Amino acid sequence: MPENPSPPLLVVLSGPSGVGKDAALNEMRKLDRPWHFVVTATTRSIRPGEVDGVDYIFLDEPTFLDMKDKNEFVECAQVYGNWYGVPKSQVTTGLDSGKDVILKIDVQGAATVRQMAPNALFIFMVPGSFEELRDRLSQRMTESTPQMELRLRIATQELGQAELFDRQVVNSEDHLKEAVADIDATISAEKQRDGRTPILLL
């Protein structure tokens, strides 16, 4: 594995639901990079094929709310009726090990992280077209029609915030590897930037 000589970087990967963030993370894990992938905690039900502790940390609501009360999350929010939170230990463990930390989070959560770690690298994934996004959500077959319509309405609002991010990466249909290569290059360029300061959670 390559050395990581510059200060560890916090990379915040965001974008609307269905844009392909999970697929991008799966491809990024295949690269030989000194990266630590944050696992988000959630109270939502596990989906077919997901693994507890790998895809998400699945918690019941009382356990989650207890952690929230103890201020054990970098940020947490209720999204689509379920709680999601980033355990502080997931971020600090990665940074303390000297690895760059990759954090996948929704747009609402990214705004909170920006306040706590303004010198992080914020990357926003966008679909090739809104029709592609609609098709991806339809193919999931895990959403009811009202839920899908809600996600599409929220996605429209979130896409309007793309300019607030440091970098936008297009994930077009059948071009996932190109999107991941773009993310990889963006991280490498940020690592080489002069004057970058260590990540401190405010």
Per-segment meaning from a language model:
Residues 1-10:
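Extreme N-terminal, non-catalytic leader segments
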Residues 14-16:
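P-loop (Walker A) phosphate-binding loop of NTP-binding proteins
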Residues 22:
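Walker A/P-loop
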Residues 4, 142, 157-202:
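NTP-dependent small-molecule kinase module
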Residues 19:
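ATP-binding Walker
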Residues 30-38:
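Post-Walker A helix-loop "phosphate-sensing" segment adjacent to the P-loop in P-loop NTPases
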Residues 42-101, 108:
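ATP-dependent small-molecule kinase phosphotransfer cores
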Residues 101-106, 116-139:
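Conserved phosphate-donor/acceptor-positioning beta-strand/loop module used by diverse small-molecule
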